[in-house]
């Protein structure tokens, strides 16, 4: 009765209008997938925080800032004037390139991220809850290792997050 088991936090079951198949959508990370996500009811382990999630995660990200970002400047551009909508178009384009295999996450992050972590191919290193803006933190902890988010909106701009550990 795997289908009756509780889904991991943020995940919901949906029906594809185009294919008529069931898929799973994470409203925290905006990720979607055909396979049922695992890990909904595991708790414990020395690296866990008692709520079934690791005490720390490691993520890389690609940030696209826009004119409404809290600091609309970056190492790439002194004054960022693009709209939020233009930033989202860029993010969605990067996601498509990564998913199609045309580009890899790390090379896009190093070329186009408005965060100084671009110099480390987007790597932010390990972090625990309380260290990042809440939407970024929630998305990072909801991802499984190796999983990439959809667009994640914070005061800094719009991110694509790749959980690496």
From Swiss-Prot:
Which Pfam families would you find in this protein's record? Rotamase, WW
Cytoplasm listed as a keyword: yes
* Reactions listed under catalytic activity: [protein]-peptidylproline (omega=180) = [protein]-peptidylproline (omega=0)
Family matches, as CDD domains = WW
Phenotype upon gene inactivation: Animals display more and larger germinal centers. In response to intranasal administration of IL33, lung inflammation is reduced compared to wild-type and is associated with low infiltration by inflammatory cells, especially granulocytes, a severe reduction in Th2-type cytokine secretion, including Il4, Il5 and Il13 in bronchial alveolar fluids, and reduced up-regulation of Il6, Csf3, Cxcl2 and Ccl5 mRNAs. In addition, the increase in IRAK3/IRAK-M protein levels in infiltrated inflammatory cells is impaired.
Entry's EC annotation? 5.2.1.8
Q: What class of enzyme is it?
A: isomerase
Tissue-wise expression: Expressed in dendritic cells (at protein level).
What does the entry's free-text domain comment contain? The WW domain is required for the interaction with STIL and KIF20B.
This protein is called: Peptidyl-prolyl cis-trans isomerase NIMA-interacting 1
